[in-house]
From Swiss-Prot:
Designated gene of the protein: thiI
Alphabetically ordered keywords of this record: ATP-binding, Cytoplasm, Disulfide bond, Nucleotide-binding, Redox-active center, RNA-binding, Thiamine biosynthesis, Transferase, tRNA-binding
Source organism: Pasteurella multocida (strain Pm70)
Catalytic activity: [ThiI sulfur-carrier protein]-S-sulfanyl-L-cysteine + a uridine in tRNA + 2 reduced [2Fe-2S]-[ferredoxin] + ATP + H(+) = [ThiI sulfur-carrier protein]-L-cysteine + a 4-thiouridine in tRNA + 2 oxidized [2Fe-2S]-[ferredoxin] + AMP + diphosphate; [ThiS sulfur-carrier protein]-C-terminal Gly-Gly-AMP + S-sulfanyl-L-cysteinyl-[cysteine desulfurase] + AH2 = [ThiS sulfur-carrier protein]-C-terminal-Gly-aminoethanethioate + L-cysteinyl-[cysteine desulfurase] + A + AMP + 2 H(+)
UniProt name for this protein: tRNA sulfurtransferase
Residue span, Rhodanese domain: 404-479
């Protein structure tokens, strides 16, 4: 099984030295991700493409899924590579491989060729196309907008029949740009802005300001872990959690109501700048969009930036909310965001849309900065992979079972896409995506025991912890 990886076009127009560096990094990223799932993987880089081979045909669907989420890949081709001797041999092998798929369809043949041959690309197109037309009575040649385009690449004595073309996410390979620190709240905006910087080639670390207790932190960890695992698992990243409840309390007590939103954001970027400086991170990322809420006017954003010692990036600055939600759906964070409370928005009842610097500074003089200093000093730092390990320690009170009793119901909490792709074929299974547990679990028959199931056990244990904290004792984790 072979895939041919085509590079993001902007990589190809770089200088030779930069392009080589980008391709080398992308090759390493592909290898890091795929070898975790298939030990037979071989990844080889060429001048303008990357070749991926596997000996395990059964891994094909999973490898396609993984390659489709690696930044730097524009598209990739599934190919069947074989040696050939003559132009007639090319036709016979093509007929054998795809003949049945052309029945009752229109088609054309497109060929690209490298090397020395007694024929050119057009000769092959005519010969193979004519042969297929003669041997498949129900098929018909149509050069303009055919049902099927038969694509063949020829290089020296080998032919590659392109069986399928898959679209990648594009962008630059992670590691080609410098690291950034994303301020993640678990909402639509911060998840999408994090993804946009990942796609642009930055390793994205996460900084979370906890305003809502353990349940809020669990939800944000789920989102950060989801984004990392899905789009940037080739790299280690940090998850930083800062308890901001004391800072919020200080603001509520000492800052004028209309200035609270801007002051809170200034405190956040101050703290994030300290974290970024500690790890040599060049910029912080926020999900702010111009005019979306009162604190996101140009005047207010400028005042917020002045509190930061780091560059502040806002990739969503011109995006509409509708566009942001659509992007969240594409990357799979929308359902998590829907279940996440928005704590920042309720801190100020009459927020200013055009804060005055002197007024803000006057209000901040009432603030005890020792509270902010304490919050930063007591920040918790995690390798994002430790979220799974931390879950093992935190959910010690949740039993893990493999055998069902009469009162047990398996609650499959995977996303609808996962359950459709890999259904759990067992008895007594109910589907309830993890993001609906908080609102719908109480509606279930509470005389039953519910065994939460997800593929890796991370999400099920995080949700078990949450439900236990909400007072539900009939929760366990199911592992096959």
């Amino acid at each position: 099984m072979k895939f041919v990886i085509k590079l993001f076009p902007e990589i190809m127009i770089k200088s030779e030295s930069v392009r080589k560096r980008f391709v080398k990094i992308l090759t390493g990223n592909i290898r890091n991700i795929l070898t975790k799932h298939d030990e037979t993987i071989a990844v080889v880089r060429h001048w303008d493409y990357i070749e991926v081979r596997s000996k395990k045909e059964e891994n094909r669907p999973h490898l396609i899924e993984l390659l489709g989420r690696i930044p730097g890949i524009h598209h990739f081709l599934e190919v069947d590579e074989k040696p050939f001797t003559t132009i007639h041999d090319i036709f016979e092998q093509t007929l054998q491989d795809i003949g049945t798929s052309l029945e009752n369809k229109t088609f054309c043949v497109r060929v690209r060729r490298k090397g020395k041959h007694t024929f050119n690309s057009l000769d092959v197109e005519r010969y193979v196309g004519g042969g297929l037309n003669q041997h498949i009575p129900s098929a018909k040649v149509q050069l303009s907008k055919p049902d099927v385009t038969v694509r063949i690449d020829i290089e020296n004595d080998n032919m590659m029949l392109i069986k399928a073309r898959h679209v990648g996410i594009g962008g630059y390979p992670i590691g080609t740009q410098e690291d950034v620190l994303s301020l993640i709240s678990g909402g639509f905006d911060s998840g999408v802005s994090s993804y946009m910087l990942i796609r642009r080639g930055s390793r994205v670390h996460y900084c979370f300001f906890n305003l809502g207790g353990a349940a809020h932190e669990i939800g944000v960890k789920q989102m950060a872990y989801h984004i990392w695992q899905r789009y940037s698992a080739s790299h280690k990243v940090r998850f930083v959690a800062i308890n901001f409840e004391g800072v919020v309390g200080e603001i509520l007590e000492k800052v004028d109501n209309g200035q609270m939103g801007v002051v809170l954001k200034r405190m956040m970027v101050r703290a994030a700048s300290r974290i970024a400086e500690r790890f040599g991170i060049q910029a912080i990322v926020t999900g702010e969009a111009l005019g979306q809420v009162s604190s996101q006017t140009l005047t207010n954003l400028r005042l917020i930036d002045e509190a930061s010692e780091s560059l502040v990036l806002r990739p969503l600055i011109t995006h509409d909310k509708e566009q942001i939600i659509a992007m969240a759906k594409e990357i799979g964070t929308d359902d998590i965001a829907k279940s996440m409370p928005e704590f920042c928005g309720v801190i100020s009842k009459n927020p200013t849309v055009k804060a005055i610097k002197a007024k803000i500074e006057q209000e901040e003089r009432h603030f005890d900065f020792a509270v902010l200093e304490s919050a930063v000093q007591n920040a918790q730092y995690l390798d994002i992979r430790q979220i799974a390990e931390q879950t093992e320690k935190e959910v010690v009170a949740v039993d893990t079972v493999a055998v069902l009793s009469a009162q047990d119901v398996i609650l499959d909490i995977r996303s609808p896409e996962e359950t459709d792709e890999k259904p759990l074929n067992m008895e007594n299974v109910q589907l309830m995506p993890f993001y609906k547990l908080s609102s719908q679990f109480a509606n279930l028959d509470q005389s039953k025991n519910y065994l939460l199931y997800c593929e890796r056990g991370v999400m099920s244990k995080l949700q078990a912890l949450y439900l236990k904290e909400q007072g539900f004792s009939n929760v366990k984790v199911f592992r096959q």
